[in-house]
């Protein structure tokens, strides 16, 4: 129900993406020795909350929204403020819909594994997830065979997560071969897509330096921090320039940008050596817990 409340606020795409990430975590944990059986004692918190949420999502899809809501209402009216079990709830479901509760329990409540095929089938009801999964299926293909497809998705898809996945798939592609992608991101105002480029770009091409500097002006402290570090490490000739630009940055409550700046400034040769003693004292001061995030 917390996820449903978020769905009302943030929309279907957010809701389905949360379900997708839950499914990935549950699938991974179900392959370990940990107890991922919902209907048991000693299961992990991931099992109780996230696999349990998935079980309810599946149930709601199987019996329909109206029947699900009726079953929940009847259940609460009948058992409010009482100690009850899952079986009582399933009986209420059976009273409003012809439902095989034994089969549901076996597949979703007493099973160590996670039915990823059914999960993917349900997730594909959302257009964003459908396009995202189509894109993921192309991860192993050579760039030359999917370049036009990726560029079309990047420039036309309305979905932020999909655009990010495109950027992740070009992380090993030389700049000369993917120039259109780099240029598109440089001119984009989507913070998350720009952040994805900063995350994956291990070396800043000479032709992209000026465009890359614009990431320092992004409305994301994380993007700014990554861009500052990358330019400082990769372009010694620009160290003083980017430090001057970022000297008044603070960042999150944990002072991530200020602390990063101090560390880089202290490690930079011939950069205000007369101020370094004070900078070092300031950096020491940020070690106190009041600056922890």
Predicted regions and their residues:
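Beta/coil-rich, acidic/histidine-enriched accessory regions frequently appended to metallopeptidases
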Residues: 81-242, 270, 274-278
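Long, low-complexity regulatory tails in eukaryotic proteins
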Residues: 261-293
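HEAT/HEAT-like alpha-solenoid repeats
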Residues: 222, 241-252, 279-284
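Short inter-helical turns and helix N-cap capping residues of alpha-solenoid HEAT/ARM repeat scaffolds
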Residues: 158-159, 189-190, 219-222, 250-257, ...
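Acidic/His/Gly-enriched intrinsically disordered linker/tail segments
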Residues: 1-57, 61-63, 79-80, 96, ...
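Short alpha-helical "patches" and their helix-cap loops
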Residues: 12-23, 67-78, 214-216, 244-247, ...
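Extracytoplasmic/secreted proteins, especially bacterial periplasmic and envelope-associated proteins
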Residues: 1-4, 50-58, 67-74, 84, ...
């Amino acid at each position: 129900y917390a996820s449903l409340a978020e769905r009302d606020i943030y929309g279907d795409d957010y809701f389905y993406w949360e379900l997708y990430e839950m499914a990935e975590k549950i699938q991974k944990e179900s392959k370990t020795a940990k107890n991922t059986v919902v209907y048991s004692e000693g299961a992990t918190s991931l099992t109780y909350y996230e696999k349990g949420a998935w079980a309810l999502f599946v149930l709601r899809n199987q019996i329909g929204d109206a029947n699900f809501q009726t079953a929940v209402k009847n259940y609460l009216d009948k058992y409010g403020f009482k100690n009850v079990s899952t079986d009582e709830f399933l009986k209420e479901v059976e009273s409003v819909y012809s439902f095989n509760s034994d089969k549901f329990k076996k597949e979703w409540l007493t099973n160590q594994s996670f039915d990823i095929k059914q999960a993917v089938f349900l997730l594909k009801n959302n257009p964003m997830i459908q396009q995202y999964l189509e894109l993921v299926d192309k991860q192993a293909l050579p760039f030359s065979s999917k370049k036009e497809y990726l560029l079309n998705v990047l420039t036309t898809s309305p979905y932020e997560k999909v655009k990010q996945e495109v950027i992740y798939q070009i992380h090993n592609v030389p700049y000369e071969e993917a120039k259109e992608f780099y240029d598109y991101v440089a001119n984009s105002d989507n913070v998350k897509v720009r952040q994805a480029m900063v995350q994956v770009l291990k070396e800043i091409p000479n032709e992209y330096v000026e465009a890359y500097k614009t990431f320092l002006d992004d409305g994301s402290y994380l993007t700014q921090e990554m861009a500052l570090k990358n330019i400082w490490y990769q372009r010694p000739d620009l160290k003083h320039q980017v430090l001057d630009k970022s000297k008044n940055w603070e960042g999150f409550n944990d002072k991530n940008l200020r602390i990063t700046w101090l560390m880089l400034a202290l490690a930079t040769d011939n950069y205000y050596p007369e101020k370094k003693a004070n900078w070092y004292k300031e950096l020491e001061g940020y070690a106190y817990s009041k600056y922890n995030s």
